[in-house]
C-alpha cells in the first residue's frame, strides 16, 4: 500500500498534469476533519480505526485527510515508555500559534506590537469586580483545617455551597444534595476522571463536531478513551433551518457506525451552551438526547460551564438539573465551573453533580491527584454564598459587558460582510471565513490562520474543533475594549490583505433562483455561494443572492452565506505529501515503514521515499 502511494507520487512528479480521478465521495475534502484528530486519539464517524495510508486507488480518501500540523513532533525518547512518548508527542494543531503568543504577548506599554489573543476562551471583562470582591476580609480567613488533608471529593462546606448554588441557579425542582457533588481543579480533570471510571482503554464516547478540541486530550491522555465524531453540516437542516444542527437521528446513525466499526461506545458528551457554536439546546432537545442515551445504556456527560454567560434577556437557558425527571439519572453527569461564568480561568475549580453514588465514589478516589487547596475552597464557598453580590453586582455587569463586546465584534464582522452564527451565549462568535480561502481545504484554512498570526492576532480555526468544513473560525470577544478593538483591526487588515492575494477566476452563483451563471472578479461579491463548495448531496438551489432571505427554512437568526468560492481543487501531489506527513508524525509509523522496507517492495522508489521523508519533516 505504501509502495502504491509512492509510485503514484513518482508518477505525479513526472507528469503533474495527469491526475487520478474517482467518483465523488459522500464527503468532499472540504468537509472532512484533519488527521490530527486521529493523532489525538479521536475517531471520525466516517473513518475506520487503525486505517493506514490510503492506496492510490482512493485519492479522494487521501485528499480529504491531508492537512498540516501545528508544530513539529518531538523525537521519541529512550527514557520514556511508549505511553510516555505518546503523551510527550501530543500536540494541538494550534500549538505553534499559542507558543508564539506566550513569547510575544501584547502589552499596552511594554509591547504594543505584541500578539493579541482572541483565540482562548477567557473572560477578561470583570477583573475590577473580582478584585474588589476577592480582597474583602472574609476572603482572607485561614482556619487550621484548611491546612490539613481534605475529603478528596472536596471540603464538605464547599460541596454544600455548590449544591445550594446549583439548586438555585439551575432552577432544580428539588434541593440538590452535597453528597452528589465532587469538586476538582477544573472541568478538564473531571472529564478525565469520568472517562476513567465509565470506560476501559480504547472505548469510545460520542461527540458532535465542531466541539471544544481540548476534550480530546481530557479523555485521551490519561484514560486512552477515544472520541467518536458525529459531523454536523454547516448547511441548514431541519424545519427550523439551523446550521450545525444536532438531532437524535444523527446520534443514532453515529452510534450505529461506531458499533459497526467495532468500537465499544460508553457515553455521549453534550455541551450546553455549546462551544464553539454558542447554541443553547431546548429542554425538549436535551430530553431527546438523554432518552437516546438511556435506550442505548450510554452515560451522558453534560458540560454547562457557560450556563450563566447568557446575556440576552429574551434567551432562556434550561439546565439538565432543572428537569422534573431525568430519563436515566444514574448515567447523567453534569459539570460546571467558575472559570467561564465567574471569569476565573486561573482559579481551577470544576464541579460535578451526579446521582450515581458508584460514579461519585469512583471519581472521588481520583481526587487525590486533582485536589484544590483548602484556602481556595474556602474563598470559593464564600463567593458562592454571597448572593447579593452575585445577583446585583457581578452577573448584571458581566452580562452587560459580554453583550456590548459581542455587539462590537458582530458589527465589525457585518462590516466585513462575514457571516456568523447569531447567538447570545458564551464569549465567542463562530464566524464563516470560507470566502477568504483560495480553495476549500484545511491546508488553506491553516494558511489563513498563520496569516492572522503574521498580523499579530491569534484565533482558533475550525480544524482545532474538528469542524468538518474548512473556513470557520472562533473569535473570542470577552476582552478589554482596547485589546478587542485593536485585535479586530488586525483581523480586518489581515483579511483585506489576504483577499487581495486571491483571484477568483472561475466560480458559479445562482441569481434570482434561475440557472447557473458565470461570475468572476469583483462581480462575484454579489453572488450567494458557489454550488461546488456545497457538501456532496446538498442542493445549491437552497441559497439565493446575499441580502435576500435564504430559502429552505433558514431562520432570521442564522447566518446568510455569501460570495463566491473557488471550486474544489484536483487531487494531486500535495495531498499525498500531506497525508504522508501525518503518518510520519504518528507514534510508530516510522518503525513500521522504513526506507529499507520500501526498497524491498520496489528498489526504484527508495529515492522517492527519502525525498518525501525530508519534505514531510520540514
Curated annotation (Swiss-Prot):
Residues 11-26 have a biased composition (Low complexity). It comes from Takifugu rubripes (Japanese pufferfish). Substrate binds at residue 122. Belongs to the class-I pyridoxal-phosphate-dependent aminotransferase family. The lineage of its organism: Eukaryota, Metazoa, Chordata, Craniata, Vertebrata. Gene3D superfamilies: Aspartate Aminotransferase, domain 1 (3.90.1150.10), Type I PLP-dependent aspartate aminotransferase-like (Major domain) (3.40.640.10). This is 1-aminocyclopropane-1-carboxylate synthase-like protein 1. Keywords: Pyridoxal phosphate. Residues 11-54 are annotated as: Disordered. Transmembrane segments: none annotated. GO terms for biological process: amino acid metabolic process; biosynthetic process. It comes from the Eukaryota. The keyword NAD does not apply. The modification N6-(pyridoxal phosphate)lysine is found at residue 340. GO terms for molecular function: pyridoxal phosphate binding; transaminase activity. The gene is accs. Residues 27-45 have a biased composition (Polar residues).
